[in-house]
From Swiss-Prot:
InterPro entries: PaxB-like (IPR039020). This is Terpene cyclase ltmB. It is a multi-pass membrane protein. GO terms for molecular function: lyase activity.
């Protein structure tokens, strides 16, 4: 995350590819913003939310933490977070409104969807804050993003297997979020390759496992959409 990095300390090798890193960040934000806008559009048409409940709460909580509690000094990055939080809240309200039809098989969930979503956000929010207090906001930002991505990718596949339904996901929705996340991987690769003193940990076994899990889960989901 640029906002937590002192670019004056970046090695010359990284400074030479910084333009490419910033391009990846731009397209990462663009991909996810397009995904959020499409989710709102589908919800307004009365279609179900394409994101499972826990990943939705987790995403909103993560964005809130790094918008309010640990805001990025990078104004462009902060603006992207504010836009993401705003759109995610619109998604949340749409999901709460459509809960009666989407969760008709669970009367308790259908009746108290709004309260359950708020409770889920609070739980995830405090978890992300606790992680930042434990390992520092710079590392917690990245690990929090990993948690959000895995919850979304694995949750989507589980939803597909359990309900035999994409839950409203379309090809455009999937491709925008997948490409946005792939741009984040490209950005992380440049950090690891050209700034190993600070970002060598991005090649740790757990990060590589998380990357492999994300790719397998999301590509599996994409193939299922085509079938």
């Amino acid at each position: 995350m640029d906002g937590f990095s002192n670019m004056e300390q970046a090695p010359l090798a990284y400074q030479e590819v910084q333009w490419l890193a910033e391009t990846f960040v731009t397209f990462m934000g663009l991909g996810w913003l397009i995904n959020y806008v499409l989710m709102i559009w589908h919800s307004r048409r009365g279609e179900p939310s394409s994101m499972a409940l826990i990943p939705l709460c987790n995403n909103i909580a993560w964005e809130l933490v790094y918008t309010i509690i640990y805001p990025s000094p990078n104004k462009v990055e902060l603006a992207a977070f504010i836009a993401g939080v705003t759109l995610n809240f619109l998604i949340m309200t749409s999901a709460a409104r459509s809960a009666r039809s989407e969760w008709s098989h669970s009367p308790t969930m259908a009746k108290h969807a709004g309260l359950i979503i708020v409770a889920g956000i609070l739980m995830c929010f405090t978890g992300h804050v606790a992680l930042a207090m434990e390992i520092g906001p710079a590392l917690a930002y990245s690990w929090g993003a990993v948690i959000c991505q895995l919850a979304l990718s694995i949750g989507g596949v589980c939803q597909l297997l359990q309900q035999h339904s994409t839950g409203g996901t379309s090809w455009k929705l999937w491709s925008s979020r997948f490409l946005g996340s792939c741009c984040a991987v490209g950005f992380a690769f440049l950090r690891w390759r050209y700034w190993p003193e600070a970002y060598g940990w991005l090649a740790s076994p757990l990060i590589l496992w998380s990357l492999a899990t994300f790719l397998v889960a999301d590509l599996t989901y994409g193939v299922c959409l085509l079938l």
